[in-house]
Regions:
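Helix-turn-helix DNA-binding elements, focusing on the entry/boundary residues of the two helices
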Residues: 18, 29, 45, 60-63
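DNA major-groove recognition helix of helix-turn-helix/homeodomain DNA-binding modules
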Residues: 59-76
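A short, Lys/Arg-rich alpha-helix, primarily the initiator
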Residues: 1-25
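Short alpha-helical DNA-recognition segment
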Residues: 26-50
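Phosphate-coordinating loops and pocket residues in cytosolic domains that bind phosphorylated ligands
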Residues: 79-80
Length: 80
C-alpha cells in the first residue's frame, strides 16, 4: 500500500520552505492567506498553519499560487 507521507510523517515537502520564505517577507500567516485569496486561492490562516506544519497536503494549483505570491518558483518551494 502506498502512503502519501514523507519519511518523517509530513504530508508535504513544501511547508518548511513556505514558512521560511513567508518569514523572510515578514508577513503573518493571515497576511499570506489574504494575499492568496486576492490571487484566487480560497485558503485561510489555519490552512497555512497546517501546510507549514506539514499536516496538510498541497495541490499543484495551490503550490503555483503560493509560489507566485511569495515571488518564488515552485521548485524553490519544493527545495529541488
Amino acid at each position: 500500500m502506498f502512503i502519501n507521507k514523507t519519511n518523517d510523517g509530513r504530508n508535504n515537502i513544501c511547508g518548511q520552505q513556505i514558512s521560511k520564505y513567508r518569514t523572510q517577507l515578514n508577513i503573518s500567516q493571515r497576511e499570506l492567506a489574504d494575499r492568496l485569496q486576492i490571487n484566487g486561492l480560497d485558503i485561510d490562516k489555519n490552512a497555512i498553519q497546517r501546510i507549514e506544519a506539514g499536516k496538510r497536503f498541497v495541490t499543484d494549483i495551490e503550490l503555483i499560487v503560493i509560489a507566485k505570491v511569495l515571488n518564488k518558483s515552485f521548485e524553490e518551494l519544493l527545495d529541488i
